[in-house]
Amino acid sequence: MHRLRLAILVCVVTLATPALAAKCGGDFNSFVASISAEAAAAGISQGVTGQAFVGVTEDASVLNFDRRQRYTFNKSFEQYVSTRVGAGRINGGRAMLQRHAALFSRIEAQFGVPRQILVAIWGLETDFGKGDMGRLPVIRTLATLAHDCRRTELFQGELLAALKIVQRGDLPLRDLIGAYAGEIGQTQFLPSSYIKYGVDFDGDGRVDLRHSVPDVLASTANLLHTNGFKMGGSYEEGSANFEAMREWNHATIYRKTIAYFADQLVGR
């Protein structure tokens, strides 16, 4: 995940999660046992939790990274976009538009989100799935952040959602790999968004946001559509569609970058 998006995430503690009872801090193994009980109450099987938590330990690198983040952003839009949207990325995005033209037509018809917006997000997040999707075991990362007492309820909710991804059969534990806040896949969904918005668009019976391009793009479109994005309208700053993208990223500068990139892709 891009660090601007991570900085926004870690400042937001109002994500809708259930009231969770596991107590943060203290002995990590005791905390994991409490989380396992929470998971069982939420319908997660003992087989899943047992496999997920066997030998799990805190990851000091995750805490160190998290505590180093700066939650202010001082670049202008012009400075920021120049580092994120260059000729190579624009050309790569146009190639994706051509390669997946039929898929984009299906997605636009079902979800009403224009293809250039989806390609812009895809490119910014992981360079169209070719870049860094994160290399950390999501369960360990989220258990570490949930045990830390600063945003424990937020990350306990994400941890339970990650377990549900495994329970549903969407991804096996070996593929549940992500970034420093537990983001997963080619457009870097948090586990709660994976559960809420994920779409099996390739028809294989599971939502795979790491390997399936149809699932990745349709799920991204579903998130935007569900939050009010409408085909044919402006997506520039001040528009209803620009506001709908808040669910993707609260940062105005990031949403302006998505809009700028999208326009470049279609020659506007």
Model regions and ranges:
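Cleaved targeting-peptide boundary
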Residues: A21-D27
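N-terminal signal peptide c-region/cleavage motif recognized by signal peptidases
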Residues: A16-A19
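Hydrophobic helical h-region of N-terminal Sec-dependent signal peptides
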Residues: L9-V13
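Mature N-terminal segment immediately following signal peptide/propeptide cleavage
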Residues: D27-G50
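Bacterial N-terminal signal peptides that target proteins for export
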Residues: M1-I8
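Catalytic glycan-binding domains that act on GlcNAc-containing polysaccharides
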Residues: I44-R268
